[in-house]
Structure formats: structure tokens, C-alpha cells
Amino acid sequence: MEHTITRDELSSLLASARPPLLLEALPAKYFEDSHLPGARNMPHDAVAELAPALAPDRAAAIVVYCANAACQNSHIAAVRLKQLGYTDVRVYAGGKQDWIAAGLPVEQGSAVTA
């Protein structure tokens, strides 16, 4: 089972001296529309292909998110990362919808995949 975190926990982690790698588990078109600041795009169905380039350090802190609490992409991606040997994987279950509802900033633009 994945470790889930709240918006406040994510905000604290992102403001820390060693912020986690933030990965959006949605397809590129949704990432381009909006994503959390500093996030990289790793669709849930491309984890095995993209993880080595996006997250070469398997011990690094990683937070995965997707659209909202009902979206399962982040949970699927987290399980796949764990299966690949990543040891510090968390899921921001509220996702983009929760972040935007709180009035927090998002970025737009093309998917950074490496």
C-alpha cells in the first residue's frame, strides 16, 4: 500500500531543503494544460519506460499525483515505482483538483520527460 500525503504535507516537502521529485501520472495533454510547479510528466502507463531517466536515484523522495482523489493513475504509478525498486514513494491523493481548489499556483507547458 502506498503512503498518501495531504496538500499541507506536500507544500511543506516542496518548501524543504530537499524537495521531492514531483511526478504527474496523467497523459501529456493534461500535464500541458496545467501541472503543479516543478512537476515532471510520467504517465502511469509509461512508468517502466520513463522512470530511469526521470528518477535515476531509486532512494530519492518521490511524490506522484494525478487529477483528483478519484483518479487512480497516481496509485498505479506508485505501485509500479515500488516494483521497480524505488523506496520513498508517496501519493498526493487530492491531486491537481485539490491543489487548484486551494488557490495554489500551477504551471502550463509541454511535458518534461527527461
Task: Set out the residue ranges of the language-model regions.
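Rhodanese-like catalytic fold shared by cysteine-dependent sulfurtransferases
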Residues: 1-21, 25-64, 68-114
